């Protein structure tokens, strides 16, 4: 997220600069160790708290530089853009973000390094919200080669009407979203094959008790959800 005092400087949670995280959290060393053991990382920008960079950094060049500094420091091959709250309907920041990320992605491609880009967005049992559909469309329009859309499959109901079957609600959200994503690409002149549609989707449930009382996503739900893509064409 953005540094609270310097809106075009990336930070970890608004509390640590990249250098601070290397010194105080030994983050760079830990990443090196993980990769030496065969693992890798993906950095997610944004989230429920604080300010995503594009929402407060209004200069295109400075915004691209902010994303670039994170991608290059950690030699990232994939990033996630977790867009929530008012950001999801804020057209200026959506368009700025797309331009900046597209710039960095193109630079990486020119250097022979792929940069996968995911969007993480709120969802209901009907799939993406209207704002979510518009955001995905605008991101692609802005030049981003989008790897996929990750649905936040959680908190489906309300205090008065909690969702009793969280697995069914999650599956319904994904079934709806796969059609929405296919429609978005069709509008771009790209016809996704059935085998491609599900590769464009991810899901992030809230394991256990959700924020809505009465909604619990169990370990059995998680096991069942893990095999859903395998059941699709």
Residue ranges of predicted features:
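Short, low-complexity, polybasic intrinsically disordered segments
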Residues: 215-233
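Chitinase-like catalytic core of GlcNAc-active glycosidases
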Residues: 1-188, 192, 196-218
